[in-house]
Amino acid sequence: NTIRYNRFGTTFTGGGGLKAEYDEIFSYALGAPTVTKDNLKETLIIVVPNSTDYGGITQMWADGSAIAFCPLSTYGYPLDSRGVVQHEAGGHGFGKLGDEYIYHNAFIDACGCGCCGHVDELNTAKSYGWYENLSLSGKTHGVGWSHLIYDSRYSDIVDVYEGGFMHSRGVYRSEQNSCMNNSIPYYNAISRESIVKRIKRYAGETFSFEDFVKNDKRDVGVEQSLAKAS
């Protein structure tokens, strides 16, 4: 192991994650001219560790505070540094979205692994108003994006797909692929809506679904992804 002394005591944990002196990071962020103790919980903080080891992680607190650790990845697209920032900072830190990728071929309510979250963790996040891109229900009227499924402007792409939050069974996502799966520059429709809702709330403005649809550009990320892959 290589020990590097750094400003915020950022270190890799045994499980492949990252940790640091969080209070010191928050204190440093308060030095920014627009950041106060009142809006710190609405402020996204990004820490770039002095490492090229792949393994970004975002620490999130119940009040909404978030610190996204985004190493300088040397992996190819879409797991490059941009992808790490899009997934960790944009997706988790600001959007409060849940992971859509799959680690285990198991039902989420029966998996006994100790390496990732399960039903309780997902429900806790839901109680905070997070993870709107995931559901434990597989019924089209029971998911949080049912309004998109039955809207002709989105029904061609939004549906109910099994698999997400690290498990292949018993948890559902809204589209086949998105940034919260493999870091491509595309957030699915419910994720985009959730992000815009948060922007509006932080700005003290009222969210309008029709305004969201009017300004939504769902093909931008898809086109960029296809161009990158070709």
Task: Name what the model sees in each region.
Residues 1-104:
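Active-site-proximal segment of zinc-dependent metalloprotease catalytic domains
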